[in-house]
Design a protein with these regions (language model features):
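Glycosyltransferase-associated regions of secretory-pathway enzymes
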Residues: 1, 18-196
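A conserved donor-nucleotide-binding helix/loop in the catalytic core
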Residues: 1-18
Length: 196
């Protein structure tokens, strides 16, 4: 899906895919023709390309070849195993096309490794000069970590405070309650008028 989205994007230049659990920490110019990012496991000396943040041009040869190879692997199956056309597949394609110079250091998006997601709730600091931070929400779920709580501590708590998420939540909640009450009142009024 993400490869097709970038390849067929309506803008002349293609687009940028960013996972929904990626937080923008700082503005960064994304005018490079290609962008591939990396992540690490426990060993931060062994980074690898990942699919959480990527960019390539609309109708690019790279995108066309990537999609064609993915379609061969999928072979019209409705279901394939996770990762089959994911990070390793993308990394191999980047290498085959000689695009390694467009690969970002893992710290630009994934400075906290996916396997260390509990750090988000610890009193650990991050490099706030980096442009993005990947939260790896699926790992939160697997580790029974609650995202829907207003944590006061840790990296996640700092981000919630910085972006005033609790205030936003309360405003939305108030609007929803008001809207629901208005809708209920309107419904009841119409209902009783019909009964009369």
């Amino acid at each position: 899906f993400r490869y097709n989205l970038l390849y067929l994007k309506k803008k002349k230049r293609g687009g940028v895919w960013v996972d929904l659990d990626m937080i923008c920490l700082n503005y960064i110019d994304l005018n490079e023709e290609y962008i591939f990012t990396q992540e690490v496991d426990e060993d931060n000396k062994k980074s690898r390309i990942t699919t959480s943040f990527l960019k390539f041009s609309r109708y690019s040869d790279f995108g066309k070849n990537l999609i064609q190879e993915a379609e061969k692997i999928i072979n019209k199956r409705k279901k394939i195993s996770w990762g089959v056309i994911g990070p390793w597949f993308l990394a191999d394609h980047v290498k085959k096309c000689g695009l390694e110079n467009f690969v970002w250091d893992y710290k630009r998006t994934c400075q906290i490794p996916w396997c260390n997601v509990k750090i988000f709730l610890d009193n650990t600091s991050i490099d706030i000069s980096q442009p993005f931070l990947h939260l790896f929400s699926e790992m939160w779920r697997l580790n029974n970590m609650e995202k829907n709580t207003f944590h006061q501590m840790g990296v996640y708590g700092q981000l919630l405070k910085k972006h005033e998420i609790e205030k936003l939540y309360n405003q939305i909640n108030t609007c929803l309650k008001t809207s629901m009450l208005d809708n209920i009142a309107s419904f009841l009024t119409k209902f009783f008028i019909k009964k009369l």
